[in-house]
Regions:
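Conserved phosphate-interacting/catalytic interface
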Residues: 17-193, 201-227, 231, 235
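Charged/polar positions within long, soluble alpha-helices
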Residues: 191, 195, 258-261
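Residue-level detector of well-ordered alpha-helical segments, enriched
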Residues: 6, 182-185, 252
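Single conserved hydrophobic/aromatic residue that forms the stacking wall/gate
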Residues: 1-11
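Acidic, carboxylate-rich catalytic segments that either coordinate divalent cations
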Residues: 226-265
């Protein structure tokens, strides 16, 4: 693929997985709205990067802030500064934001609010760790976690949304979140890149990462465990999740070797 296409795909896939399920679709739409050329012009200024990231997410309009926080958001200054910067940059590059109504907040832990995840992604981009080359250079799980590790800008250490203050917290990605990002982002990218380029070392590395990481702990994996299956690592859990979604849920028992053997009894 052309380099620009590779970058766009890498950022799209990474962004989608920053939604951790609930906001996955919204983050993908956001990534598709992200003008990489425009951001590249200002990548040495973290404030401007965050302004474009937040603005393209549709989060810099006053009506996106809960009414009880609007006055404080205007008074603390950061929201207004970001918004003014985005208005300038959006005019300069003819930017159009996504529909903010795509974001979901209900039953979402504050740590997973779009503002927090977008600030973390802005930090990654600013620190030159959002591209494909950095992921390809990570030869171990430890190195991959170092590439993915990020925190928020200073304002978000004491906020979860504009105008709503909280106890100071640097809001690093948790070990659990890092594992999920490696499983759902790094591994597929390594495997696809290896297949496309005919370089098996990347495919092998993807499998090595899955074998090293702990199995996911979700309702699908627990269901299989209750059936007596041993799930030793992330490779096992990914296989069982795929089995459930592509065969069980679609009633494809006759195409499934396990289902076929079960039905023969």
């Amino acid at each position: 693929y052309p380099l620009r296409r590779q970058r766009q795909m890498c950022i799209r896939d990474r962004a989608r997985n920053y939604g951790f399920g609930i906001n996955g679709d919204a983050f993908e739409q956001w990534a598709l709205k992200l003008p990489l050329r425009a951001v590249d012009h200002h990548r040495d200024d973290l404030f401007q990067v965050e302004a474009i990231f937040m603005g393209q997410a549709g989060l810099l309009e006053l009506n996106t802030i809960p009414e009880r926080y609007q006055k404080d958001a205007l008074n603390d200054g950061y929201f207004a500064r970001l918004r003014n910067e985005y208005l300038y940059l959006s005019h300069k590059f003819s930017l159009q934001p996504m529909d903010y109504k795509l974001w979901r907040f209900l039953r979402l832990r504050p740590q997973n609010f779009p503002h927090i995840r977008i600030s973390q992604l802005a930090n990654l981009y600013y620190n030159r760790r959002a591209g494909l080359s950095q992921l390809l250079e990570a030869t171990t799980v430890k190195e991959a976690k170092k590439v993915l590790s990020t925190s928020v800008t200073e304002y978000w250490e004491t906020h979860y949304t504009f105008g709503s203050t909280s106890i100071r917290n640097e809001k690093h990605l948790s070990p659990f979140s890092l594992n999920l990002l490696i499983i759902n982002t790094v591994v597929p990218i390594l495997f696809a890149y290896g297949r496309h380029r005919g370089e098996e070392k990347y495919c092998d590395r993807a499998f090595d990462f899955l074998e090293e990481l702990k199995a996911e702990n979700n309702h699908i994996v627990r269901m299989w465990q209750q059936c007596g299956l041993e799930v030793e690592n992330a490779g096992d859990s990914q296989a069982l999740i795929q089995l459930k979604k592509e065969y069980c849920d679609k009633k494809e028992c006759l195409r499934c070797r396990i289902g076929y053997e079960y039905l023969k009894r």
